[in-house]
Structure formats: structure tokens, C-alpha cells
Design a protein with these regions (language model features):
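Structural detector for internal amphipathic alpha-helices that build alpha-solenoid repeat scaffolds
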Residues: 5, 9-25, 36, 45-56, ...
Length: 167
């Protein structure tokens, strides 16, 4: 009931289950409830569940992608964070889908996930030109993970424009 009901008493129960009954968390049905718990109104519970789901295997990814809404709020941000943590570059197409269709918050997480594949250099370079503000800064951050001379050149241009604002 701790994953489906409301009330502050649930935090300790969920925490106890995570710390002491890890075998219970391997039950496929419980994983569905945990994913549902990502939308919990208590952010501490959502965060705790997110961190636990990041320790699971990739078999939960289809559950996380089921009914995924790139325009969604906190629950979808947690889902995307878990997917990128588990799958790294394997879900590269999904990250691009989220960038093209997502809310600003979803886009930011998805842009961050592009760092896992060196093949994303052209896509990231495009983002540094098309995105603005926080998303542009995130694209430049991810560009720092790329081992390509073009990334270095783009960073040089970035700092030459407004050196103190870009630090």
C-alpha cells in the first residue's frame, strides 16, 4: 500500500523495503508500482524510488517508456533520468525524440544524455546553434564530452564571444 496510497507514513515503509527486502523489488509487479510512485506528490519518495530504479536492470526500460509523455512533468523527468542512467548510448534515438518533442525540462535531460555517444557530435553542434539559454548551455556542456576537433573549435568561439558570461 505504501506505493499506491497517500500519507507521510509511507516514506519509512518504502525506505525499509528498499534497504531490507531487495528481493521483493525484483518482482515485476512491484516494479510497476515503483514506476507509478515516480509521480508521488512527496518528492522525497519520488527521489528515493528513482535512485532505486537506477540500480535495476534494463528490463524495466519498456515499463518506463510505456505511456512516456515528453511534455510531461517531474515523473517523466525521473523516467528519462533512469533510462539514461541504465542504457547510456543504447537509447540515443529516444533521447533525440525527447529533444525534438519534449518540454524544456525534458529536453535538458535528453541533451545531457547525448554525452554517451561520440556519434552525436554533429547533432550536438547543431544544438549549440539552434537552442537558446539554458538548453544551449547544456549542449555546450555535453560538447565537452566529445573527442573531436570541431568541439574544441566551437568551445573557442563560445569563449571568444563573451568570455566572462560563459564561465
Amino acid at each position: 500500500y505504501a506505493l499506491t496510497e497517500t500519507g507521510s507514513w509511507r516514506y519509512e515503509i518504502i525506505e525499509d523495503i528498499i534497504e531490507n527486502n531487495s528481493k521483493l523489488l525484483n518482482d515485476f509487479r512491484v516494479k510497476n508500482y515503483m514506476i507509478h510512485g515516480l509521480s508521488d506528490k512527496y518528492s522525497e519518495i519520488s527521489y528515493m524510488i528513482t535512485e532505486e530504479l537506477k540500480k535495476q536492470t534494463k528490463e524495466i526500460v519498456p515499463l518506463l517508456k510505456d505511456d512516456f509523455d515528453p511534455q510531461g512533468k517531474r515523473e517523466m523527468i525521473y523516467r528519462l533520468d533512469i533510462i539514461s542512467s541504465l542504457c547510456k548510448e543504447e537509447e540515443n534515438d529516444f533521447y533525440k525524440y525527447c529533444i525534438e518533442n519534449g518540454s524544456k525540462e525534458i529536453k535538458e535531460i535528453a541533451i545531457g544524455a547525448l554525452k554517451y555517444s561520440q556519434d552525436n557530435i554533429d547533432y550536438i553542434l547543431d544544438l549549440t546553434k539552434t537552442e537558446k539559454g539554458k538548453l544551449k548551455n547544456k549542449a555546450f556542456e555535453v560538447l565537452s564530452y566529445m573527442s573531436d576537433d570541431r568541439a574544441v573549435k566551437e568551445w573557442d568561439k563560445f569563449f571568444k564571444k563573451k568570455p566572462f558570461e560563459n564561465i
